[in-house]
A protein has these predicted regions:
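Ankyrin-repeat inter-repeat connecting loop/turn
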Residues: 49-50, 83, 116, 150, ...
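Conserved ankyrin/ankyrin-like repeat signature
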Residues: 38, 71-72, 104-105, 137-138, ...
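Membrane-associated feature with strongest affinity for ZDHHC
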Residues: 245, 249-375, 382-391, 395-449
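Ankyrin repeat boundary/linker residues
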Residues: 20, 54, 87, 120, ...
Length: 449
């Protein structure tokens, strides 16, 4: 799989830190190293042209754009530089900007007439180059502000999500899936993005694609007849092959495999726990408290016995409460969801927002929402949960912001873990009961323990 060939001048080189020591001999080197003073001298005093390429066919505006010098780019445009000038590979300055993700330079170029959909000899657009180099913020910027086509194919039929999967940039994949990029598209080799992620052994990229995808992406074969799992196994990526094989098994058409890997995995142990509580309660009442063949229980024994029954009934009440909403985040289309604009990311100031921490994993490509901090997507419930801890099989529900305190009574490991707080928690339950339980205090206890 070929990659875009763009020469990069190191931004942390000694020459760039001290332009006076750089070998600045013409307008091209002046633009590459950001020596604005010498550039003006070459142009205004020596009469050098900014519209002609160097010996390799590269333009001054490309070098300035690559190394993120927006003031020099603006100067070049004002002095005859062509924003759409192309080199021997038909790449424009915008292609070079995408390598470094220089948003400020991209704005200068695009506001001065640069074509956002310009293609090179390989059919790469700026969105393809940004995906190849993992420039997620840059990609989102040109899509939101300049309506760049994030799903356009190159000459080999590969869209930006193919390149992001091949290079293993999971955040870029999340953004593209969040914007409804087609993850089932096959290129000329018959490969989907999942095929390329499996070939390179990128576990996180495969995980994002599988959780946001369907059975079809797991089972589709390339032109050689291989599925993503088979390609991962053939390349020696055992962890990826195992993950994809398990995902295939969960979607198996065989009724037994589908039952155990699919339905039972979703249902969990909740029916077993529910039936156990009911059966033990009935047996206790019939065999001990109301047994006709046993001596009549004393008042003290009866008090403790019915207290045990009350605890059992209370457990059923809490079991019912655990089956409720654990703190699901509202999705587009849900009742109570407010969407002020067509683009969800337009509502967020990426530089100054209590909700945004600069982590693109906050985007959920499945639920199409921007998650708050500490929220995660549950692949079993297929919902995003606020303050997600884990999916508990004993209650067949997630443990999140709302249910973290109640889950304590159904998880033996958590009960041992929180032994020092046992008396305090029981006291709080006796005083406030479940409906008025202070969730914030319980959550803090859960975290501290």
């Amino acid at each position: 799989m070929a990659s875009s060939e763009i020469e990069v001048v190191s931004s942390d080189s000694k020459a760039q830190q001290n332009p006076s020591e750089a070998p600045v001999i013409d307008v091209f080197s002046a633009c590459a190293y950001g020596d604005f003073q010498k550039l003006r001298k070459f142009v205004e005093e020596d009469g050098a042209s900014l519209s002609q390429p160097d010996l390799n066919g590269y333009y001054a505006i490309q070098w300035a754009a690559l190394n993120n010098f927006p003031d020099i780019v603006q100067y070049i445009i004002e002095h005859g530089g062509d924003v759409n000038a192309t080199d021997n590979m038909q790449q424009t300055a915008l292609h070079w900007v995408a390598v470094r993700g220089a948003i400020a330079v991209a704005d200068v170029l695009l506001q001065n007439g640069a074509r956002v959909e310009a293609v090179d000899v390989n059919g790469y657009r700026a969105v393809h180059v940004a995906a190849q180099y993992g420039q997620t913020a840059f990609l989102n910027h040109i899509v939101v502000k300049y309506q760049a086509d994030f799903d356009a194919p190159d000459n080999e039929g590969r869209s930006p999500i193919h390149w992001a999967a091949y290079k293993g940039f999971a955040d870029t994949i999340r953004l593209l899936l969040f914007r409804d990029a087609c993850q089932g598209r096959q290129d000329k080799e018959g490969c989907t993005p999942l095929h390329w992620a499996a070939i390179r052994g990128h576990v996180e990229a495969c995980t994002v694609l599988v959780h946001a995808g369907t059975k079809q992406e797991l089972m589709v074969k390339d032109n050689a007849g291989f599925t993503p799992a088979q390609l991962a196994s053939d390349k020696g990526h055992r962890h990826v092959a195992l993950f994809l094989s398990n995902a295939q098994r969960a979607h198996s058409n065989h009724w037994l495999g589908k039952f155990w890997s699919g339905k039972m995995a979703d249902i969990g142990y909740a029916p077993i726990l529910f039936c156990t509580i009911i059966i033990l309660t009935v047996l206790f009442i019939n065999s001990i408290l109301a047994a006709p063949n046993l001596p009549k229980v004393t008042a003290v024994v009866g008090l403790w016995g019915w207290a045990a029954v009350s605890v059992s009934v209370g457990s059923l009440v809490m079991f019912y409460r655990c089956s409720k909403d654990p703190g699901y985040l509202k999705r587009p289309g849900d009742v109570g969801y407010h969407k002020d604009t067509e683009d969800l990311l337009l509502n967020i100031d990426l530089n100054n927002s209590s909700m945004w921490t600069g982590n693109w994993s906050q985007l959920c490509p499945t639920c199409k929402i921007v998650r708050p901090v500490r929220s995660k997507h549950c692949p079993i419930c297929k919902r995003c949960v606020e303050q997600f801890d884990h999916h508990c099989p004993w209650i067949s529900n997630c443990v999140g912001k709302v249910r973290s305190c109640i889950n304590y009574y159904f998880c033996p490991s958590q009960k041992r873990k929180m032994k020092p707080f046992d008396g305090f928690i029981k006291f709080c339950f006796l005083i406030k009961w479940v409906d008025v339980w202070d969730k914030d205090i319980a959550s803090e206890i859960f975290i501290i323990s």
